[in-house]
Structure formats: structure tokens, C-alpha cells
Amino acid sequence: MESQENSKKSSKSNNKLEKIYSTSLPDGYRFTEFRIGDENNWAYIQYSAGVFKDYQLAIRRIFKEENSLKGNFKNRCVFLENENGERIGTIMIVPSLSEEEGVQEIKYLALLPKYQEKGLGKLLISKAYKMVDDVEGATRINLEAYNDKSIVLFENLGFERL
């Protein structure tokens, strides 16, 4: 499996997927699926986490992703909610633009700043891997990291830059 960061450097897994799969949600936390109308929530989390430097750019990006998936976000984008039902994080999987068939990308990992560095990013990555398992014909996963914190998280989970 490979990982790609924003600078287009690649990574691969060290066969340490047990670090990813052996996660459980804290009491009261849950995953909810993205639904049409959730665009502002998604953009707010992405912008707050520093994935996008401009809120409007984040809004444009989610609509672009919706269009490319023709609105079929089922099992493609999720939110992590805390015990109060507040959406605090999100992650998405999309078909890769590479010419190789069956490649899925894990993208847009983001957590609100006060929830970062608490192990919750690992939960989102675990959920994304499980979502990829449900994609028919998925053969490989690319990871995309947009900031240094995401890159460090992926490396701590056993991925290496190629």
C-alpha cells in the first residue's frame, strides 16, 4: 500500500495494519455518514484544522468531490462526533485519478484543533480503511496528507515515505 502527501512524496505500509484496525471509539463517540446538506460542517472542520487556508476553497472542494462521485457519498465520507453530538472530525475515500483500476484514496483527514493529538485521527484512519474494505474492486489504497501533523500520524502508524 502506498501513501502520498501533498508534496507528492510516496509512502508504504510496514505491514502494521494492526495499529490501524485495533482501535475502538471512546464512550459516547460515534461515526455518522456525510449527507447532502453537510457541506458547511465538512468545510468548517477542514478549514479549522488547517487543511484549507480559505473556508470558501473548502466549500468549493466538497462540492467538486460531490460532483465527481455524482452525489454518492454513501460509505465515502464520515464525520466523527463526540459525546455531545458535535462533529469534530472527518475523513473521505475517493477513487484515485490514477490510471490503475481499483485504487482508492484516503483524503481530507481533519480534526478540530482541540481534538488533535488525542488518538482520534487514528480512529478516522481506521474507519477509512474499513470503508475501503467495502468498496467493490478496491486493490490498493493511497493516503494523502495535507499537513505535517497528518504526515507524522501516518508515519507513526507504520507508513514510510518512498
Question: Residue spans of the language-model regions?
Answer:
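Conserved active-site alpha-helix within GNAT-family acetyltransferase domains
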Residues: K122, N147-L162
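Extended, hydrophobic alpha-helical segments in both membrane/secreted and soluble proteins
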Residues: E105-I106, I141, S150
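Conserved GNAT acetyl-CoA-binding A-motif
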Residues: V132-Y146
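Conserved acetyl-CoA-binding loop-helix of GNAT-fold acetyltransferases
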Residues: L111, E117-V132, N156
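A short beta-loop-alpha structural element at the N-terminal edge
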Residues: R30-W42
